[in-house]
Amino acid sequence: MPGNAGTEQTTTVIIGTGLSGLAVAAELCRRGVDSIVVDGLDILGASHPANTASLQRCDAADSDTLRERNEILRHLRNYAASHDVDIRNTTRAVQLTMVDGLALGGGLATPARPQWEVRTPTGILVADNIVLTRCAHSQLRRMINDFGIAVGRNLTAAMRAIGIYLVGVGELITPSPKEVLRQAKTVGQAISAKVNPDSGPYPATGSFAALPC
């Protein structure tokens, strides 16, 4: 790939630099889990572009909720800046590929615990976990089918089984800001438990812990 800057390894790649992406990045940072946040995903699965324009915003007509959302965003951006969270606002993912971790030379992954290659215009990000934000359920189901995995009724469980987590994703409308924070906390706990299975929960300290849930 022209201009490829090489391959980077991280625990989690978060796709989306909005409220959902920043919330889960801050939660992971608070728990000592590294992540890289990219702006979005231009290709979803093998051949389906990510299209979130059809999703309605639940707060579009609610000025109080919009103010709350903006205040939380401001807080999250300040947290990210002060804690050196790796946010790449001008970088978009152009391909998402599930790979056998053993093929990458790490020797840690198993067929039941694949790794992910996230291609960007400047290189490849290799991660154990992917967090998706603002994608329609129908697109997510197509993506899982493209990977040859039976979805069944529980989309979230099917995706978590292969290391993909959802934050801020709704069927018809986007969740409220407080619901996004709740989802981010749940996903942060799940990923942290995979990374540090023998450690106890991190204490809810720091300014991010004071955000409403």
Functional labels for PLM-detected ranges:
Residues 24, 47, 99, 141-144, ...:
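Short glycine-/acidic-enriched loop or helix-start segments at secondary-structure transitions
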Residues 89-114:
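A conserved short coil-to-beta-strand element within the FAD-binding core of flavoproteins
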Residues 2-20:
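Beta1/beta-strand and adjacent pyrophosphate-binding region of the FAD-binding site
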Residues 13-15, 117-118, 123-138:
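Short hydrophobic core segments
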